[in-house]
Amino acid sequence: MAMKRVLGYLKHTQDFSLHYKKYPVVIKGYNDANWITGSNEVKSTSGYVFTLSGVAVSWRSFKQTCIARSTIESEFIALDKAGEEAEWLRNFLEDIPYWPKPLAPVCIHCDSQAAIGRAGSMMYNGKSCHIRRRHNTVRELLSSGIIMIDYVKSKDNVSYPLTKGLSREGVEKSSKRMGLRPRTSCHNGNST
């Protein structure tokens, strides 16, 4: 059944493409996690989307490699992975000779206020070593100015469809926010 849905999606979106704009050249990240929802599942799902000038340049949806014992642990694992990708993207842009320097921190939008609060905390009081390591990584990325974390409502989180099932309208809305448009609308002089 899932394969039929994927094939149907591909069939109906073959005339769509990502439309990159020239300005403003700002990189933003969005991350989300879906803690174990089904009784047969043991691992949570993470997802992130990074946009450049409002158009997706990097995205990923994946099962987490360790078992999260709570929603906040699941969100923090997702935030750690998004932080790794943000650091890679920022380093990539810094290596481009004509890219404006210095680069601003990559803003990662997260819909978990608890994870945002934990990220800014100097102490991790949990007992899980795998979460402590991720906390230290995120805290280091924050303190070194590579990333900053900001709250976004779930309904405005561009990465939301990578971790949860959405209605057709939800998928269409999220696709537009990632810069996916019909090919006929790409020649308005502002896209490349």
Which residues fall in each region the model found?
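Generic, well-ordered alpha-helical scaffold segments in large soluble proteins
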Residues: 2-9, 13, 85, 92, ...
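Structured nucleic-acid-interacting core domains from mobile-element enzymes and related host factors
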Residues: 8-33, 101-102
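Short helix-interrupting loop/turn segments at helix-coil junctions
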Residues: 11-18, 37, 57, 144-150
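Short, conserved, surface-exposed binding loops centered on an aromatic residue
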Residues: 19-20, 38-41, 98-100
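RNase H-like nuclease module associated with reverse transcription
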Residues: 24-26, 44, 62-192
